[in-house]
């Protein structure tokens, strides 16, 4: 386990500060490969004399102030180089010109071009194109600002998280202790740390007293690690004499020499590794790109075909170019950009209410397409608090209550042995509750002390009342603190129980060491000699609890003889003058960081949703496996190679790995695997746990999953997780326990640190993908009744049935609210029962969606519009036969005697009023047929009658579009502003039959879909 490049003094990876050529292909790849290697350094193997020579530090007086200033000038401040951030204007431009916006910009430019051509050629300049260009530009700018504002809001929340680095450090220079800003600590400085401090740089410990550090942000180990001057392991991350930058000292004191500062620390290397990783495009960005290709393809194909056709029909070049531009622009769904942005924003808000903060909108959908989740164990799957799980006394195992709300099992507390055990656990314990928490529930209280002692303290407080009172009654007179050589902690107390001796000795520690010091055992409150049978019982209990992945402690006591130890006896803990052997064994207590309540259910949900959950942890394999079984990552009945070997009683190497569905892989084994071996494991095992892994390995695991084609979500809270968070398709950081570095690297933050929230997020992501399909299907359908009038106008030479301004009224007016309302649609079936979508096959917009929207529903809609158009012209005297070829005379403002079918003559003004009335009627017809389209788009497979009309926003959308259409048609002054004229009430009904036809047609199609799944109707029309 470890990080780093194979050099004693490791260089930081290239960042802009160090003149590295970032982003220059080969060099950068090489740097990243360097960073992925494990750390090697020699400092932990050196003697104090060698350290003194290497760093020139006096081991008692420290550096001189002058020398420290020189080193500071040479190495720069002891701080992490901030990751290169994207300037705000670049972010803004991305929103304005990225993806879909580009399509609209091209449309706008083409409009201005068409307007310019008409103006220059002195044809009657028609201002429609100018308006259209302006409106398109406005749409892009407004939605761009909106998306930018959304993301800026999330990044402001991020800014508020920055407070990772330690502020002050205690150094010794010229023999004096100085408190200086941690940024000014230099290599070779002599530094002192005490409980509660953050380690200011990578230190080589030269002296320590009971020092423990919390390395969880670096290695993921939840237990505090002892620090001492002893060289205990070749691996710098495992040895006791190195303390790492930005980890916490939880108790004791230590003095050390700074061996690395800033970016050269182990933590600094990880941060550099994270900031250098490139995240790819999000799945939804890929989808939108694909969609733009389709739309552009259709537009250009239609435009060019009709350009050639209009030349064949003897139009002038100039007119043909204007037609070409007109058709391309008519194909652009102006309202869709806004719809997609609003839909994603709504989902992001909904997720925020469910404790998922999404940093960029596109991540919303990515979570929905996730097929593998690599989850951290501590704090995400578990509660991140050690809790007493089992006890062994009176020769049987009792289960304690580990639930968060104390609703679980309780055990028999009447046995006198339990009273004795609880007394030892409370007295032989240095953990305390800080004052002022009397009204806080016991389990929620803060504790000063290490994780195991806190667990014991809370357990005894819950079962037996105030531990503080117990300690006050049984006053402590002597103590030997825990140390790594004797592996026990002992204290002597004045005994408050008058029926026993004056002094009570209590001891706890590693079970086998405690048992060795005992000659008797307490059963039902009576002392009995410790025979082989009882020793076996102890051994079995110890193995059983250890096998559950729990941390087991043994407890014993001794009532000291009143004659030997009279009142006021002076206990000497240096030269021990009291017995520490021949004690009475009382029992075992085992602790575990228990799983969160909702996790097993959610892991099951992931499994039925086809999502593979992999546990990646820095913890012990036994503990990791126990928790994996507890939360269902390894499901009941599935065995690992070790389980099979134990069952068949054969060596592990004789088991075929393919026989085991589950596997637990140790970090050290992972270190020696090549990419093919990792791929083999990921491919052939469904349930995988990686234990004792380093951050680099987490990154390698993520890359392995991505090679399999998986879309990977990774959760993490430590700095150690940030490279993997950055590399994953979606990185999920923890809001409560997460370090700032991990929050910076992630795409999403879980505000309650709970795995269950991820699954909620997956559900929301899948739902928005379905609903976006529906929104797009709805929006695209009206494109056909908008384009066909223009095409028929060119081919049949008839008066224009639908004008540009009216098209805008549909796309940016009546269609907007209904399209957005589909984002609120409920899921049709259980979304979490289907496999994750395959990004290569299952597209947001596919050929089937286009064929439904353009080829089927859209065509029926166009018929409805034309029907209204011909009805109005016929009522005014122009029968369809008269209209063919009438266009040139109709458009000429100097011809005032165009004859209708009845021989009446029409002036230019009168003709135009009839034409604009037709535009209005065509517009209203599209609104009427879009009612049916909105209702059929609610579902893709179910009948609307099964789904019901529960979506209130959608019902509002139906009324809103109708009200808006009526307003535009009847409001005084609209004839001047938008050239819309009032309609006779009967003309509203022209499109009703077509609306009904659409509804019936689609209900029948969905019925066939449900009756014969996988049939040709599904293959051709299910989008």
From Swiss-Prot:
<dbReference type="InterPro" id="IPR006068">
    <property type="entry name" value="ATPase_P-typ_cation-transptr_C"/>
</dbReference>
<dbReference type="GO" id="GO:0016020">
    <property type="term" value="C:membrane"/>
</dbReference>
<keyword id="KW-0547">Nucleotide-binding</keyword>
<dbReference type="GO" id="GO:1902600">
    <property type="term" value="P:proton transmembrane transport"/>
</dbReference>
<dbReference type="GO" id="GO:0036376">
    <property type="term" value="P:sodium ion export across plasma membrane"/>
</dbReference>
<protein>
    <recommendedName>
        <fullName>Sodium/potassium-transporting ATPase subunit alpha-1</fullName>
        <ecNumber>7.2.2.13</ecNumber>
    </recommendedName>
</protein>
<dbReference type="GO" id="GO:0005890">
    <property type="term" value="C:sodium:potassium-exchanging ATPase complex"/>
</dbReference>
<dbReference type="InterPro" id="IPR004014">
    <property type="entry name" value="ATPase_P-typ_cation-transptr_N"/>
</dbReference>
<feature type="transmembrane region" description="Helical">
    <location>
        <begin position="773"/>
        <end position="792"/>
    </location>
</feature>
<dbReference type="InterPro" id="IPR050510">
    <property type="entry name" value="Cation_transp_ATPase_P-type"/>
</dbReference>
<dbReference type="Pfam" id="PF00690">
    <property type="entry name" value="Cation_ATPase_N"/>
</dbReference>
<feature type="binding site">
    <location>
        <position position="721"/>
    </location>
    <ligand>
        <name>Mg(2+)</name>
    </ligand>
</feature>
<feature type="propeptide">
    <location>
        <begin position="1"/>
        <end position="5"/>
    </location>
</feature>
<feature type="transmembrane region" description="Helical">
    <location>
        <begin position="132"/>
        <end position="152"/>
    </location>
</feature>
<dbReference type="InterPro" id="IPR005775">
    <property type="entry name" value="P-type_ATPase_IIC"/>
</dbReference>
<keyword id="KW-0915">Sodium</keyword>
<keyword id="KW-0479">Metal-binding</keyword>
<keyword id="KW-0597">Phosphoprotein</keyword>
<feature type="modified residue" description="Phosphoserine; by PKA">
    <location>
        <position position="943"/>
    </location>
</feature>
<dbReference type="InterPro" id="IPR036412">
    <property type="entry name" value="HAD-like_sf"/>
</dbReference>
<dbReference type="GO" id="GO:0046872">
    <property type="term" value="F:metal ion binding"/>
</dbReference>
<feature type="transmembrane region" description="Helical">
    <location>
        <begin position="321"/>
        <end position="338"/>
    </location>
</feature>
<dbReference type="InterPro" id="IPR023299">
    <property type="entry name" value="ATPase_P-typ_cyto_dom_N"/>
</dbReference>
<dbReference type="InterPro" id="IPR008250">
    <property type="entry name" value="ATPase_P-typ_transduc_dom_A_sf"/>
</dbReference>
<feature type="modified residue" description="Phosphothreonine; by PKC">
    <location>
        <position position="15"/>
    </location>
</feature>
<dbReference type="GO" id="GO:0016887">
    <property type="term" value="F:ATP hydrolysis activity"/>
</dbReference>
<feature type="compositionally biased region" description="Basic and acidic residues">
    <location>
        <begin position="1"/>
        <end position="11"/>
    </location>
</feature>
<comment type="similarity">
    <text>Belongs to the cation transport ATPase (P-type) (TC 3.A.3) family. Type IIC subfamily.</text>
</comment>
<feature type="transmembrane region" description="Helical">
    <location>
        <begin position="803"/>
        <end position="823"/>
    </location>
</feature>
<keyword id="KW-0812">Transmembrane</keyword>
<comment type="function">
    <text>This is the catalytic component of the active enzyme, which catalyzes the hydrolysis of ATP coupled with the exchange of sodium and potassium ions across the plasma membrane. This action creates the electrochemical gradient of sodium and potassium ions, providing the energy for active transport of various nutrients.</text>
</comment>
<dbReference type="GO" id="GO:0030007">
    <property type="term" value="P:intracellular potassium ion homeostasis"/>
</dbReference>
<dbReference type="Pfam" id="PF13246">
    <property type="entry name" value="Cation_ATPase"/>
</dbReference>
<feature type="topological domain" description="Extracellular">
    <location>
        <begin position="309"/>
        <end position="320"/>
    </location>
</feature>
<feature type="topological domain" description="Cytoplasmic">
    <location>
        <begin position="153"/>
        <end position="288"/>
    </location>
</feature>
<keyword id="KW-0472">Membrane</keyword>
<feature type="transmembrane region" description="Helical">
    <location>
        <begin position="986"/>
        <end position="1006"/>
    </location>
</feature>
<keyword id="KW-0460">Magnesium</keyword>
<keyword id="KW-1133">Transmembrane helix</keyword>
<dbReference type="InterPro" id="IPR001757">
    <property type="entry name" value="P_typ_ATPase"/>
</dbReference>
<keyword id="KW-0633">Potassium transport</keyword>
<dbReference type="GO" id="GO:0005524">
    <property type="term" value="F:ATP binding"/>
</dbReference>
């Amino acid at each position: 386990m470890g990080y780093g490049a194979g050099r004693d003094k490791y260089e930081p990876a290239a960042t802009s500060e160090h003149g590295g050529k970032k982003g220059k292909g080969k060099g950068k790849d090489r740097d990243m490969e360097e960073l992925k290697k494990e750390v090697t350094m020699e400092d932990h193997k050196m003697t104090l004399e060698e350290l003194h020579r290497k760093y020139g530090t006096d081991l008692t007086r420290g550096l001189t102030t002058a020398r420290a200033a020189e080193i500071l000038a040479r190495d720069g401040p002891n701080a992490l180089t901030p990751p290169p951030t994207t300037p705000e204007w670049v972010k803004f431009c991305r929103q304005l010109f990225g993806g879909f916006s580009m399509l609209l910009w091209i449309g706008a430019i083409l409009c201005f071009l068409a307007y310019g051509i008409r103006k220059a050629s002195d044809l009657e300049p028609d201002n429609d194109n100018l308006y259209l260009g302006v409106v398109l530009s406005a749409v892009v700018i407004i939605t761009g600002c909106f998306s930018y504002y959304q993301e800026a809001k999330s990044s402001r929340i991020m800014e508020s998280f920055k407070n990772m680095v330690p502020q002050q450090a205690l150094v010794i220079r010229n023999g004096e202790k100085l408190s200086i800003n941690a940024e000014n600590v230099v290599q070779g400085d002599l530094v002192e740390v005490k409980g509660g401090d953050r380690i200011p740089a990578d230190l080589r410990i030269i002296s320590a007293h009971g020092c423990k550090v919390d390395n969880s942000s670096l290695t993921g180990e939840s237990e505090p690690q002892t620090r001492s001057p002893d060289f205990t392991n070749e691996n710098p991350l495992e040895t006791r004499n190195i303390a790492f930058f930005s980890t916490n000292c939880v108790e004791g004191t230590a003095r050390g020499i700074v061996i690395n500062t800033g970016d050269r620390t182990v933590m600094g290397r990880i941060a550099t590794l994270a900031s250098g990783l490139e995240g790819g495009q999000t799945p939804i960005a890929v989808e939108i790109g694909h969609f733009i290709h389709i739309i552009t393809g259709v537009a250009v194909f239609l435009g060019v075909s009709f350009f050639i056709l209009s030349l064949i029909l003897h139009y002038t070049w100039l007119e043909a170019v204007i037609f070409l531009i007109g058709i391309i622009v008519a194909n652009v769904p102006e309202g869709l950009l806004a719809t997609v942005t609003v839909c994603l924003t709504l989902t992001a808000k909904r997720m925020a209410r469910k404790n998922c903060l999404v940093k960029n909108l596109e991540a919303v959908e990515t979570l929905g397409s996730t097929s593998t989740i690599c989850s951290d164990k501590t704090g995400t799957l578990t509660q991140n608090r050690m809790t007493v799980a089992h006890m062994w006394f009176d020769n049987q195992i009792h289960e304690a209550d580990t639930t968060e709300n104390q609703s679980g099992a309780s055990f028999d507390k009447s046995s006198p042995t339990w009273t004795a055990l609880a007394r030892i656990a409370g007295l032989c314990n240095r953990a305390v509750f800080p004052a002022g928490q009397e009204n806080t529930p016991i389990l929620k209280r803060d504790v000063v002390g290490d994780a195991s002692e806190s667990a014991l303290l809370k357990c005894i407080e819950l079962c037996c009342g105030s531990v503080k009172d117990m300690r006050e009654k049984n006053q402590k007179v002597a103590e030997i603190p825990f140390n790594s050589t004797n592996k026990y902690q002992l204290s002597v107390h004045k005994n408050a129980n008058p029926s026993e001796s004056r002094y009570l000795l209590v001891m706890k520690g590693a079970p086998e060491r405690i048992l060795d010091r005992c000659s008797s055992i307490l059963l039902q409150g009576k002392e009995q000699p410790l025979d082989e049978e009882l020793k076996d019982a102890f051994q079995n209990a110890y193995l059983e609890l250890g096998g559950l992945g729990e941390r087991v402690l043994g407890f014993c006591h001794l009532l000291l003889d009143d004659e030997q130890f009279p009142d006021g006896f002076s206990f000497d803990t240096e030269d021990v003058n009291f017995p520490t052997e021949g004690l009475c064994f009382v029992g075992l207590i085992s602790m575990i960081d228990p799983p969160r309540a909702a996790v097993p259910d959610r892991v099951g949900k992931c499994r039925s949703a086809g999502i593979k959950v992999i546990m990646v942890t820095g913890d012990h394999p036994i503990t990791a496996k126990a928790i994996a079984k507890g939360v269902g990552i390894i499901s009941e009945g599935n065995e690992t190679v070790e389980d099979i070997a134990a069952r068949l009683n054969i060596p592990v190497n004789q088991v075929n790995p393919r026989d085991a569905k589950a596997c637990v892989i140790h970090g050290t084994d992972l270190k020696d695997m090549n990419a093919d071996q990792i791929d083999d494991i990921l491919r052939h095992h469904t349930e995988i746990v990686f234990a004792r892994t380093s951050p680099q390995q987490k990154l390698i695991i993520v890359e392995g999953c991505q090679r399999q084609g998986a879309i990977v979500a990774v959760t993490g809270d430590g700095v150690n997780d940030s490279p993997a968070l950055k590399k994953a398709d979606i990185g999920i950081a923890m809001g409560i326990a997460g370090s700032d570095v991990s929050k910076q690297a992630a795409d999403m933050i879980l505000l309650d640190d709970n795995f269950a929230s991820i699954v909620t997020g997956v559900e929301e992501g899948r739902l928005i993908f379905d609903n976006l399909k529906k929104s797009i299907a709805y929006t695209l359908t009206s494109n056909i009744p908008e384009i066909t009038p223009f095409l028929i106008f060119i081919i049949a030479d008839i008066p224009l049935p639908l004008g540009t301004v009216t098209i805008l009224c549909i796309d940016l007016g009546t269609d907007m609210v209904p399209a957005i309302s589909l984002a609120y649609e409920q899921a049709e079936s259980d979304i979490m029962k289907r496999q994750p979508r395959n990004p290569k096959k299952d597209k947001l917009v596919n050929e089937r969606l286009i064929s439904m929207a353009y080829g089927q529903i859209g065509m029926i809609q166009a018929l409805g519009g034309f029907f209204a158009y011909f009805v109005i012209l016929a009522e005014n005297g122009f029968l369809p036969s008269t209209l063919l070829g009438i266009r040139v005379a109709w458009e000429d403002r100097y011809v005032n005697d165009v004859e209708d079918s009845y021989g009446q003559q029409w002036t230019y003004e009168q003709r135009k009023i009839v034409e604009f009335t037709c535009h209005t009627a065509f517009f209203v017809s599209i609104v009427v047929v879009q009612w049916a389209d909105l209702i059929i788009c609610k579902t893709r497979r179910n009948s609307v009658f099964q789904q019901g009309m529960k979506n209130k926003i959608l019902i509002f959308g139906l009324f809103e579009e109708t009200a808006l259409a009526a307003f535009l048609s009847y409001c005084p002054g609209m004839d001047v502003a938008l050239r819309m004229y009032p309609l006779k009430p009967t003309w509203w009904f022209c499109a009703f039959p077509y609306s009904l036809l659409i509804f019936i047609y689609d209900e029948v199609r969905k019925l066939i879909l449900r009756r014969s799944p996988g049939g040709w109707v599904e293959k051709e029309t299910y989008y």
